[in-house]
Amino acid sequence: MSHPSTLVLIPARMAATRLPGKPLLDIAGLPMIVHVLRRAEAADVGPVAVATDTAEIAAAVEAHGGRVVMTRADHPSGSDRVAEALGVLDPDGRIEIVVNLQGDFPTIRPDNIGAVLGPLADPAVDIATLCAEIHTEEEATNPNVVKVIGSPLSPARLRALYFTRATAPWGEGPRYHHIGLYAYRRAALQRFIALPPSALEQREKLEQLRALEAGMRIDVGIVDTVPRGVDTAADLETARRILSSRN
């Protein structure tokens, strides 16, 4: 169900080094960014727009009926781009929650986008995100898989204590793979982008640690599966296979 106080923003840029022009790469007849747009629209949680500094991305999105906000090219992170776009689209401050959906998640399930809003039902939560349980040792030990260490609040939710590329926590019990989808309260997003990069953020190369080090609360919804991001040529072929089979 759409929420008038919620906005979904998809930051997109052409600067990927491993897959040049990534947002516009063809997957089953559509640019990747359009697949992400369609998933966000299907989630039906609120209006959707793509935030970009690139005319080619804007043209592709608009050609498929999507809304675009042009942003500056010098943003240090997707969160900063999202904050600028939010200010352009909603200068009067009516939007209370903004979802930051990465533009390289063409196979994300719409219900995952809805699920990220769940933790924000608790007014004490500043930022919400998602995770899924890790089931293989390869995933547990892979430094490219970010793990959530959290205190269980319910069978479907954690309060985040830390995020790491290491294999953690120690001992028996579940480990969780972080999914890079965020929902921010508007005030939390503005506070976050005003903070300087933190020591642990720079060490782990994980932006969300800046919020934890500043005392902000991040809660994490637990979902069944991790959506496949597209970072490599192999990821791209996997996404093409998945989405071609759906058509």
Curated annotation (Swiss-Prot):
EC code(s) of this entry: 2.7.7.38
Keywords of the record: Cytoplasm, Lipopolysaccharide biosynthesis, Nucleotidyltransferase, Transferase
SUPFAM superfamilies the record matches: Nucleotide-diphospho-sugar transferases
GO terms for cellular component: cytosol
Catalyzed reaction equations: 3-deoxy-alpha-D-manno-oct-2-ulosonate + CTP = CMP-3-deoxy-beta-D-manno-octulosonate + diphosphate
Superkingdom of source: Bacteria
CDD domains: CMP-KDO-Synthetase
Protein's UniProt keywords contain Cytoplasm: yes
Enzyme class (EC, first level): transferase
Gene3D superfamilies per record: Spore Coat Polysaccharide Biosynthesis Protein SpsA, Chain A (3.90.550.10)
Pathway entry: Nucleotide-sugar biosynthesis; CMP-3-deoxy-D-manno-octulosonate biosynthesis; CMP-3-deoxy-D-manno-octulosonate from 3-deoxy-D-manno-octulosonate and CTP: step 1/1; Bacterial outer membrane biogenesis; lipopolysaccharide biosynthesis
Annotated compartments: Cytoplasm
Coiled-coil spans in chain: none
Single GO MF descriptor: 3-deoxy-manno-octulosonate cytidylyltransferase activity
Any one GO BP annotation for this protein: lipopolysaccharide biosynthetic process
Job description of the protein: Activates KDO (a required 8-carbon sugar) for incorporation into bacterial lipopolysaccharide in Gram-negative bacteria.
Entry-linked HAMAP family: KdsB
Family according to the record: Belongs to the KdsB family.
Annotated PANTHER family: 3-DEOXY-MANNO-OCTULOSONATE CYTIDYLYLTRANSFERASE, 3-DEOXY-MANNO-OCTULOSONATE CYTIDYLYLTRANSFERASE, MITOCHONDRIAL
The protein, known as: 3-deoxy-manno-octulosonate cytidylyltransferase
Organism: Rhodopseudomonas palustris (strain BisA53)
